[in-house]
Amino acid sequence: SAASDVYKRQGVQGEMCNRGYNTMKGYYKNPEATAEVIDKDNFLHSGDLGIKDEDGNYRITGRIKDMIIRGGENIYPREIEEFLYKLDGVKDVQVAGIPSKKYGEAVGAFIILQEGVKMQEADVRDFCRNKISRYKIPKYIFFVNEFPMTGSGKIQKFRLKDLGLQLCKEQGIEII
């Protein structure tokens, strides 16, 4: 199966899947939910993206549902977030897909600045230029004070899309 192939390939990102005696057989009295996460070969699909290194260890690199698909290109938000953390003055950053008429989704960066730091969108784009692929450079850059959070303190990535659309509307930015 495609799931088992991920385990064999080093350096190739894919969905983290597992099976074995310690893996659940399914959700109690819920065959529909079970069918969504367990394939015909009994692999449990975690929804996490990961990569196998040269030592045979796996590293989680993100979540499948967070992946941005821009004009056929798969963009992993965590990769861009890790890059933007290197920009002086950035305290925290989250990247999410913003709906796009032309590309399906465009990259949106939500940045919390360190106290007292002033930054413009152009500063972020200049930092990215010639260092990451053009299609990964954020089309939309929003400076925010906080991210939408759950009661337990986790960032609600799925709400960033709506926040991005709202901020575009408030700022008069046309969605292309």
Give the role of each language-model region.
Residues 5, 20, 25-26, 33-36, ...:
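AMP-binding/adenylate-forming catalytic core of the ANL superfamily
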